Amino acid sequence: DVWMNLDERVGHTLLLGTSSVGTTRLAELLIAQDIRRGDVVIVIDPKGDAELLQRVYTDASAAGRVADLLIFHLGFPERSARYNAIGRFSRITEVATRIANQLPSAGNSAAFKEFAWRFVNIIARALVSLGEQPDFERIRRYISDIEPLFVRYARHYLNENGDDDWQEAVETRASKISNRNVPHAMRGRHADAVGLYQYLQLNSIYEPVLDGLMSTFKYDGSYFDKIVSSVGPLLEKLCSGTVAELLSPRGEDDRPVLDWMDVIRRRGIVYVGLDALSDTTVASAVGNAMFADLVSVAGHLYKHGLGDGSDIMPTISLHADEFNELIGDEFV
């Protein structure tokens, strides 16, 4: 028998080995013991190994903890829990960082990555200010066409802070707009949107979120498409088919939603299968954003605790197979 003192597992444990030498089987042994010990157990498996999933379920059942088990699997979306990887954050800038970190940053790509970060951050700030939770689908929609979000936010802001006659003034300006009297970059925009922009500009109305939307709105559409071209394909992959329903949860779906704070408070068990063999890009993006989310939650717990009145922090055991495929800068 080979024994390992639990005190030796405080911090990180790294297990190295090539294929078929038993690294996953050893992980199963450690996972089984953590489940039976009553820990919060999180298993992240890039390939989505069916045997590992079966072992997690079997051990949870044997420990009387099946009700605590939540399964998120990109390979079986119809049976999977849902998860919004950019919906929870300590700072709003984390939303843009989790998306932009999936983009290449070598050479000339670095500039496009910074542009993508800025525009995603503008969209995320506007959504939160409107009382909406950011998700991949909303980000994809508005990074393709910022105009609807600009109009919504501008109207929301003016309703709260504008003059009593702002609507009439905007309508008057909009009625006089044509392609002959607007800048080339704004040709093709709706007259109502251009009227709002001109009203805000002429009245020197400044608010940080609104200013960001205005600066984006005034770009020529073809130029804007070029500078955010790097993030578009990634978001399309994350928002296509049945995977979109998992990664951008909506209220009408009755499948459970994975929330790390909830998992930790109820001392749950989570199995995550990323199905990397089917789509490496999506698996890497979701896995990296998931780790960034966990790091953010860890920071919240460190500063504020569980927030449920309990002074006792549960033991959290995180098992990540093929960790090198998942790790991002946020975790280091």
Q: Over which residues does each language-model region extend?
A:
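P-loop NTPase motor domains
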Residues: 6-9, 16-332
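N-terminal pre-Walker A segment at the start of P-loop NTPase domains
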Residues: 1-2
